[in-house]
Regions:
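Short acidic (Asp/Glu) and glycine-rich catalytic loops that position anionic groups and cofactors
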Residues: 39-43, 176-180, 221-225
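Metal-dependent nuclease catalytic cores that hydrolyze phosphodiester bonds in DNA/RNA
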Residues: 1-159, 264-270
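Non-catalytic protein-protein interaction segments used by genome-maintenance enzymes to assemble
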Residues: 149-193
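Secondary-structure boundary elements
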Residues: 135-141, 166-171, 204-211
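Hydrophobic (often cysteine-bearing) scaffold residues that line and stabilize catalytic clefts
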Residues: 53, 57, 195, 239
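Metal-dependent nuclease catalytic regions and adjoining charged, substrate-binding loops involved
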Residues: 6-8, 185-190, 198-272
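Short histidine-centered catalytic/ligand-binding loop motif
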Residues: 47-50, 108-115, 181-191, 232-234
Length: 272
C-alpha cells in the first residue's frame, strides 16, 4: 500500500462525518437536490441520519476489503456457532435474548461491533468475491483507502472521502447490491452520477488532475457476483454541469438561509 499523498488527509470516519456542518459532501448534495430542507436539518443535527442493516453490512465490507483483515478483526466480532455459553440446567446454549448470553457476548466482543454469523459469512463472501475478480482486485492492488479531500467550489467548502484512491487508475467506489443486473437502473435512481462527478471535481481541484471514476459493485447474496463500472466522458461531463448548478443553488440557499421542500407550489398530475 502506498503512502498517502500530502493533499489527501488521513482522517477517522467520525471526524469526517462530524464536519458535515462545515463541508458539503456528495451525499449532502444529493440530499439537497431531493429536498433542501431535509439537507439543512441533517446538516444542523436536527434530523439524525438514518442507518440500516444494509449500511452496517456495507461499512463492515469496506473495512475488510479496503483496510484489511487485521483492521476488520479489531473492529468486528462474530459469535461462531458452537462457542455460545451452555445452560447447565438444560444442556443447551442460552438464548440470544437472555442476560447470560448478552453478558457473554459483551465480554467476547470487547467493544467491537457484533456481526451475526450469517452477516459475517456475507461480508467474508463478498470480500472473497472482490479479491477473485480480476478487474476489481487490480484496481485495489495499489493505492490508499478512505482518503479525504477538502477544497472550495463556487465559494462552498466541500469534502469527499474516497473509498480507494489508486494513483495510476483513479477513484474507486465500493458498493453492495441485491442484483448486479439492476446497477444501471440504480445508478440513475440514487444519483450515483452526481456522486461520481462530485468526487472527480473535488479531486481535480485538490490533486490537479482529472481522475477516472470506477464503481466496484458486489452482490450481497451468493454467488456474490462482482462488476466494475465506469462512466463515459460525455455522461460524466453532463453530471459535472449538474453538480456545478446544484452547488450554485446551494450557495444561494446558504446566503439567503432559504431551505424549501420543493413542493411549495401546486403541481399538476397528468396532462393539461
Amino acid at each position: 500500500m502506498t503512502t498517502i499523498p500530502t493533499p489527501i488527509l488521513n482522517m477517522p470516519a467520525e471526524e469526517y462525518h462530524e464536519a458535515r456542518a462545515s463541508y458539503l459532501t456528495s451525499h449532502g448534495l444529493m440530499d439537497y437536490i431531493k429536498c433542501p430542507l431535509t439537507h439543512r436539518l441533517k446538516q444542523s443535527g436536527m434530523m439524525p441520519n438514518k442507518t440500516s442493516k444494509s449500511f452496517a453490512i456495507g461499512t463492515a465490507l469496506h473495512t475488510l476489503v479496503l483496510e484489511g483483515t487485521a483492521e476488520f478483526e479489531r473492529n468486528y466480532f462474530s459469535p461462531f456457532p458452537g462457542t455460545e455459553p451452555i445452560n447447565e440446567k438444560t444442556g443447551k446454549p442460552y438464548g440470544v435474548a437472555t442476560k447470560a448470553y448478552t453478558d457473554w457476548l459483551e465480554s467476547e466482543a470487547l467493544g467491537r461491533e457484533v456481526l451475526s454469523p450469517s452477516d459475517y459469512d456475507m461480508v467474508v463472501g463478498m470480500h472473497n468475491a472482490v479479491q477473485h475478480h480480476t478487474e476489481a482486485s487490480t484496481l485495489l492492488s495499489d493505492g490508499t483507502p478512505e482518503g479525504v479531500l477538502r477544497t472550495t467550489i463556487n465559494g462552498v467548502d466541500v469534502q469527499t472521502r474516497m473509498d480507494w484512491y489508486n494513483p495510476c487508475a483513479g477513484i474507486v467506489d465500493l458498493k453492495t447490491i441485491g442484483d448486479l443486473d439492476d446497477f444501471g437502473e440504480q445508478f440513475d435512481k440514487y444519483n450515483y452520477g452526481i456522486q461520481a462527478a462530485f468526487y472527480q471535481m473535488v479531486a481535480e481541484e485538490v490533486l490537479g488532475k482529472c481522475l477516472p471514476f470506477y464503481a466496484t459493485v458486489v452482490e450481497k447474496a451468493p454467488t456474490h457476483r462482482v462488476g466494475v463500472f465506469t462512466v463515459n466522458t460525455h455522461t460524466l461531463e453532463r453530471y459535472r454541469r449538474q453538480v456545478e448548478r446544484h452547488i450554485e443553488r446551494y450557495a444561494q440557499s446558504m446566503a439567503a438561509n432559504d431551505w424549501p421542500t420543493g413542493y411549495e407550489s401546486i403541481r399538476m398530475i397528468g396532462g393539461e
